[in-house]
Amino acid sequence: MSEQLLTASTPIDAAPLSDNTVQTTAPATSKINLLDLNRQQMREFFAEMGEKPFRADQVMKWMYHYCYDDFEQMTDINKGLRAKLQRVAEIRAPEVAEEQRSVDGTIKWAIKVGDQQVETVYIPEADRATLCVSSQVGCALECKFCSTAQQGFNRNLRVSEIIGQVWRAAKIIGSLKSTGTRPITNVVMMGMGEPLLNLNNVVPAMDIMMDDFGFGLSKRRVTLSTSGVVPALDKLGDMIDVALAISLHAPTDDIRDEIVPINRKYNIEMFLAAVRRYLDKSKANGGRVTVEYVMLDHINDSTEQAHQLAECLKDTPCKINLIPWNPFPGAPYGRSSNSRVDRFSKVLMEYGFTTIVRKTRGDDIDAACGQLAGEVIDRTKRTLKKKMAGEPIAIKTV
C-alpha cells in the first residue's frame, strides 16, 4: 500500500464486549453520508446506482485526498452521476465547535457530534504530526486518573464521526500548509472512549485511514490503544491489522483493579495473553506492543513497582512509554516527580526494555493525555449515583 501525507458511563458489565453494535443514531438527513462507507461499501452503493466500481474509487479519492465535500468539485465525474449523487448522498463531516492552540503547536478541536462534543488533538513533532482521535462520546471504563472517564458514557461514534475527525483536521491543516504546518502522518485512537467497545465503527474508520483511496496511511502509522477488553481484542486481530498500544498503568492486579476497573473482569495475565495472541497475527507492530504507563505519585511509581513491571512484561515483547500524569479538577492524584520517573525508567532499562518518558504536549489547553473531556450528557446510572452520594475514591499509596 502506498503511503501519503494527510494534507487537505455505562457500567463495564453492561458495555458491549465481543458483540459490538453499529451506532444507529439517526442522521440529520435521509441522504447516505459517504463518510460512513469504506471502499467495499462504497462500491456496493455505487453498484446499486448502476455504476462501475471505479466510480466509487474516484469519488473516494476526491473525498480523502483533497478533502472535497461538494460533488460539483469532482471534475472527472460526469454531470449525470454528480446530479444523481446530489440527490441521494452527501459528504458530511462533523463541524468544529471550538479550536484551541497551545504554545507548543498542539491544536485541540471540540468537534460537534449531534448535540454533544468530542475532542480531537493535532500534535506536531520534528519528524511527524500525530492526530489523536476519539471513538466514543464519554467512556464506560471509569479509569480513575482520566478526565474522560469522569464524564460517564453516552454513545458510540458512527464511522462518519470517527473518520470525519481525520477529514476535518486534514482539511484545516491543509489550509495551513503555507505556514509550514506539518501534514498529518500518524493517527492514534487514543482520544475519548475505549475503541474496542465500538469495534464495528472503529474498524471501518481505520480501514479508510489505510485505504489507498482513503488517507493512505501505512498500518504502522495507525495505532489503537485499549485498556484491555480481552474478547474484543481477540476479535480485532481477525478484523484488521494496526499498531497496538495498551493502557497498562500498573504492575499488579491489586493496584490496577483500583485505577483501571476493567481489570477486575480481565486481569493483567488475561490481558497480556490476548496481546501476545494479537502480536502473533499482526505485521503492523514489528513483533512488539507499546505499553502505556501513567506515572501517579506514590501510587504506581516506586522502584519496587518498576521491578514488578519488568517481571510482569518479561514474556511480552514491548517498548514502554512512561507518561507524566496530567491533572484535572477534582482528581485525587499527583504527578510523579522527575526523580521518581527517572529511577523507574532506569530500572526498566536495566532489564533491557526500550523505555521512553513521553513529553507532555498541549497541557496548557487541556489537550494532554487523560485530559480530554468534551461535552457529554452523562447517562451512566452508576456514575450519577456516586456523584450524588459523594462516594470517596479509595487510594493505596506506596
Curated annotation (Swiss-Prot):
Radical SAM core domain residues: 125-364
Catalysed reaction equations from the record: adenosine(2503) in 23S rRNA + 2 reduced [2Fe-2S]-[ferredoxin] + 2 S-adenosyl-L-methionine = 2-methyladenosine(2503) in 23S rRNA + 5'-deoxyadenosine + L-methionine + 2 oxidized [2Fe-2S]-[ferredoxin] + S-adenosyl-L-homocysteine; adenosine(37) in tRNA + 2 reduced [2Fe-2S]-[ferredoxin] + 2 S-adenosyl-L-methionine = 2-methyladenosine(37) in tRNA + 5'-deoxyadenosine + L-methionine + 2 oxidized [2Fe-2S]-[ferredoxin] + S-adenosyl-L-homocysteine
This protein's UniProt keywords: 4Fe-4S, Cytoplasm, Disulfide bond, Iron, Iron-sulfur, Metal-binding, Methyltransferase, rRNA processing, S-adenosyl-L-methionine, Transferase, tRNA processing
Family designation: Belongs to the radical SAM superfamily. RlmN family.
More about this protein: Reaction proceeds by a ping-pong mechanism involving intermediate methylation of a conserved cysteine residue.
Function: Specifically methylates position 2 of adenine 2503 in 23S rRNA and position 2 of adenine 37 in tRNAs. m2A2503 modification seems to play a crucial role in the proofreading step occurring at the peptidyl transferase center and thus would serve to optimize ribosomal fidelity.
Designated name of the protein: Dual-specificity RNA methyltransferase RlmN
Annotated organism of origin: Yersinia pseudotuberculosis serotype IB (strain PB1/+)
Gene: rlmN
